[in-house]
Amino acid sequence: MEMEFPKIVAILGLGVSGCAIAEALLRRGVKVVGADEKVSLDELERREYVERLLGQGLELILGKNAFARLIGLQPKLAILSPGISVHREDIKALARSGAKIVGEVEFSYRLLAEELGRDKVCLIAVTGTKGKTTTVHLIARMLEASGLRTILAGNVGVPLAKFVDEFPRDKESPPVRVVMEVSSFQLATCETFRPDIAAVTTLFVDHLDWHSSVEDYRLSKAKIFANQRGDDWAVLNADNAGVRWMAQFVRGKILWCGKEVASSCPYCTHWVSDDGEIVWASLGGDKFPVARLSEFILRGEHNRQNLRVAIGTALLAGARPDVIADVIRNFKGVPNRLELVGEVNGIKFINDSAATTPDAAAAGIRSFDAPIVLIAGGRDKGGNWNGFEKALRERVKALVAMGEFADRLVAMSMKVGVKVTKASSMDEAVKRAVEFAEPGDIVLLSPGCASQDMFRNYEHRGEEFRKAVRELSSEN
């Protein structure tokens, strides 16, 4: 069944997902107006993609007031990219003008449900303040290695709208497992989105620069369960207080994952736990071993929590335990997440650029026993810095502060007695860090902040760190 569309559809934000949705709509003969706050075509990250869409009939509005200018066109549907807050005044004005504001995940899900049919897809959605990307990569590899047709979609992998267009329409096509990473931004605008399996890694405070309040952020995350049915699953990290709070919103069945959940939750029938050496699981019967923790290369308790959630989710989706163990042995991690990028003169350089919250940075700091010279800072997102300050006091020998939050970090470092300096570029930050470091130390980029004050995104920040380390290595 083909989905029906209004005469004009607006796309707000022309990133990867925005362009994919625009292309899907243009294929269906819809008039599409793309709006982006970049002031020129050359500034768009997906410039070549947008140019191709212009050739297919896309109309384009650029500039700082691009979204407000859409009002004059009176679109009845506006599809929002994840980074654009529904609480902005120009978005509220667009809604008051008669436009239905829908997020890109919600729109793509409707496209999937109406044109493909839900029986063709086992939809696995993973959310959480941190840990999503590592977890979805683990799940996808476990399913693929088990011989199950699997697509990695959403924030990482293929945009969901693009997957819908490329999926075979014949009835004989086997069901596919779609593994998606979904953010609070995307969930906030969901109305019908229903994953068969909804997994949650962690819940801390984050994105208060986008959400109207802490409560708004938490409730947006909980919307991942809103449309689930009694036979759907939630996979929850029992070792995180925020995730335990989310359990009250679950409508289906729960598989708990935790360090001691097997002993602390005797009434639980489905769980993943470990005894410090072996990861065990139960799917309603006797427990069985899955993997050895010593064979999992990623550091830190937070990554072990991600692993347990990934195992539970993959088992529910049909992965084989012996294959899961093999994937764990060979998994090397994901870029920008405690990634070893080099060693110079006995000093290891670790890229944790994806740590964009204070809690994530604190977890990164606590992943190492060696002395740490920390590079941190950027644009604060309104998080709680108490845990970071404690980790700074206990585990960091010196700090190089960057970006808009640098002065706050300097004051924090002086308060806890940690050596500190400031840097105005990543190249300078790495050089300053080396001045503090000695052989055996770790230089850790774990910013605790967003990147957009100095970089395009956290990936760009991580690449600049790699580049600075490469240049340092070539000089020695």
What spans do the regions from the language model cover?
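Nucleotide phosphate-binding/pyrophosphate-handling subdomain across enzymes
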Residues: 2-8, 20-28, 291-396, 411
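Short, basic phosphate-binding NTP loop
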Residues: 2-12, 16-125, 146, 329, ...
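Phosphate-binding loop of NTP-binding sites
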Residues: 8, 24-27, 68-73, 82-238, ...
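Residue-level signal for inorganic ion chemistry
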Residues: 25, 78, 101, 126, ...
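Short beta-strand "acidic-cap" motif of Rossmann-like dinucleotide-binding folds
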Residues: 31-36, 151-152, 179, 256, ...
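Short internal beta-strands
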Residues: 31-39, 234-238, 375-376, 395-404
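Beta-strand->loop->alpha-helix junctions that form or flank phosphate-binding loops
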Residues: 36, 61-64, 102-109, 153, ...
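C-terminal helical cap/extension that packs against the catalytic core
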Residues: 47-56, 386-441, 476
